[in-house]
A protein has these predicted regions:
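Bacterial N-terminal signal peptides that target proteins for export
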Residues: 3-16
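Carbohydrate-binding/catalytic loop surfaces
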Residues: 159, 220-228, 309-316
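Active-site-proximal helix/loop microenvironment
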Residues: 204-280
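Structured C-terminal helix/loop/strand segments within mature extracytoplasmic catalytic/sensor domains
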Residues: 2-5, 28-76, 184, 189, ...
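Short, flexible turn/loop "capping" segments at secondary-structure junctions
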Residues: 171-174, 243-247, 337
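Active-site-adjacent loops and short helices of periplasmic peptidoglycan-processing enzymes
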Residues: 30-221
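C-terminal motif of bacterial Sec signal peptides marking the signal peptidase cleavage site
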Residues: 24-26
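Hydrophobic membrane-insertion alpha-helices, especially the h-region
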Residues: 18-22
Length: 372
C-alpha cells in the first residue's frame, strides 16, 4: 500500500484523481444494477448551437439609362402638331428605355397585324407543328379583298406554293390572301390571340381576319363574291353615306385590331432580343422584314446609309378624305449594332400622304440624331 503521508498536498491530489476512475470501474463491475443505491450513469447529448440563416438579398437590377431628352421632345412635338390621331413610340432594344407620345391609345393596325400572324406561324414551326416547306395550293376560294397580287397566279388547278412563300408574300408584299391562308392554317384568329397572350405582348388586339375586318369597316356584311375584281368597291359605293360614316367612325373609335404604339414597339424589341421565337425563326422573320417592298417613303425614307431596317406597313380604308390607319413599324439597327424599335400609327387623318410620310421620316431622323 502507498503511504500518502510521504506525498505533498499536490501529489496526494494527483494520486487520488488517478485512483478515482479505477475505483468507479470496480464498483461498476462488482455491483449489480439491481443493487440498492445504484445510480444510473446519465447519457449526455452534446447540443451545438445552429446559426440563424441570413437571407441573401436579391440583387436589384440597375434602372435603364434615361432616354435622350431630345428624342422625347421631338416626338412629343411631332404628335401634338400633327393634324390627326397619331401614336408614336420608340424603344431601345439594348438599353431598355422607351419614349412615346400618345403611345397608350389603341390605333387601327390594319396590315401591321400580319406580323402577329407570321409570329404565330413561326411559333408553330418552333413547336414542330408545321414546317415552312409544307405545301399549299391557293385557289379562288381563298381570295379576300384589296391587295392580293397572288390572285394573278391562280390557274385552273390553283397555285401550288409553300408556307414559306405565303409568309414571304404576306410580309414583303402585304398580300391579304396569303395572310388569311396562313391565319386559317394555324387555326384562325384565336390562335393568334393565344400567341399574343402567352407572350404577354400587352395592348395588342387581333381582329377577325381580313374579310370580316374590311367588310365591317365599310359597313358591309361579307360575301365571298366581293373577293373577285372590284365587287367589294362597288358594293361599298352603293351604301348610304350615313351607313359608311357610322361604320368608319365606329372602327376608329374602337378598332377590333387596335394596338398601342408602345405595345408594338416593345413587342418588336422582344422579337429582336430573341424572346419570342427560336433563334432561327427570329433571324428568318427579321431578314424577311428587311426585304419588304412596301412603304419605301414611310419610316424607311429617312434610314441613313449603313443602317438596316426591317418593317411592316399598314393602310386602312379612306372615306371623305380621311384614312383609318396609315402605319409603319419596324426595327432600326445602327452600324455599331445598337437597335431601336419604332412604331408610328396614324389612326385617323386627312393630311396628304406626303405629309404623313414626312411625320414618319422625322421620327426616324430624330432616333438617328440621338443615337450614340
Amino acid at each position: 500500500m502507498i503511504e500518502l503521508g510521504k506525498f505533498t498536498v499536490a501529489q496526494r491530489a494527483m494520486t487520488i484523481a488517478g485512483f478515482a476512475p479505477a475505483m468507479l470501474v470496480g464498483c461498476a463491475v462488482h455491483q449489480s444494477p439491481s443493487s440498492a443505491g445504484y445510480v444510473p450513469v446519465p447519457e449526455y447529448a452534446v447540443r451545438m448551437p445552429v446559426p440563424t440563416p441570413v437571407p441573401t438579398p436579391t440583387p436589384v437590377p440597375p434602372p435603364p439609362p434615361e432616354a435622350p431628352a431630345g428624342l422625347l421632345s421631338t416626338i412629343t412635338a411631332l404628335e401634338s402638331q400633327f393634324d390627326g390621331i397619331v401614336g408614336i413610340a420608340v424603344t431601345s432594344v439594348d438599353d431598355g428605355w422607351s419614349v412615346a407620345a400618345n403611345g397608350e391609345r389603341r390605333m387601327p393596325q390594319q396590315s401591321v397585324s400580319k406580323l402577329w400572324v407570321a409570329m404565330t406561324v413561326l411559333d408553330y414551326r418552333d413547336q414542330g407543328r408545321l414546317t415552312l416547306d409544307d405545301p399549299y395550293t391557293v385557289t379562288k376560294a381563298d381570295l379576300t379583298v384589296f391587295h392580293q397580287p397572288v390572285a394573278t397566279l391562280i390557274g385552273e388547278n390553283g397555285y401550288p406554293t409553300t408556307i414559306r412563300e405565303l409568309l414571304r408574300r404576306a410580309l414583303t408584299n402585304s398580300d391579304n390572301t396569303c395572310n388569311d391562308i396562313l391565319l386559317r392554317y394555324v387555326g384562325g384568329p384565336d390562335s393568334v390571340r393565344d400567341f399574343i397572350a402567352r407572350k404577354q405582348l400587352g395592348a395588342i388586339r387581333f381582329g377577325p381576319g381580313e374579310r370580316l375586318l374590311q367588310a365591317g369597316t365599310a359597313g358591309l356584311e361579307w360575301r365571298q363574291e366581293y373577293s373577285i375584281g372590284r365587287a367589294f368597291y362597288q358594293a361599298r359605293a352603293a351604301l348610304p353615306s350615313a351607313v359608311r360614316l357610322s361604320a368608319f367612325n365606329n372602327y376608329i373609335a374602337d378598332p377590333p385590331d387596335g394596338a398601342t404604339a408602345t405595345a408594338i414597339a416593345q413587342a418588336l424589341a422582344q422579337l429582336k432580343r430573341g424572346e419570342l421565337l427560336s433563334a432561327d425563326s427570329t433571324s428568318w422573320l427579321i431578314a424577311t422584314m428587311e426585304s419588304s417592298h412596301t412603304g419605301r417613303q414611310r419610316l424607311r425614307g429617312a434610314v441613313p446609309a449603313g443602317w438596316s431596317f426591317g418593317h411592316k406597313t399598314g393602310t386602312g380604308q379612306d372615306f371623305s378624305g380621311r384614312t383609318a390607319g396609315y402605319n409603319d413599324v419596324g426595327i432600326l439597327t445602327a452600324p455599331n449594332g445598337k437597335s431601336y424599335t419604332i412604331a408610328v400609327l396614324i389612326g385617323d387623318t386627312s393630311r396628304t400622304i406626303p405629309q404623313r410620310q414626312e411625320l414618319m421620316q422625322a421620327v426616324v431622323a430624330s432616333v438617328v440624331a440621338n443615337h450614340h
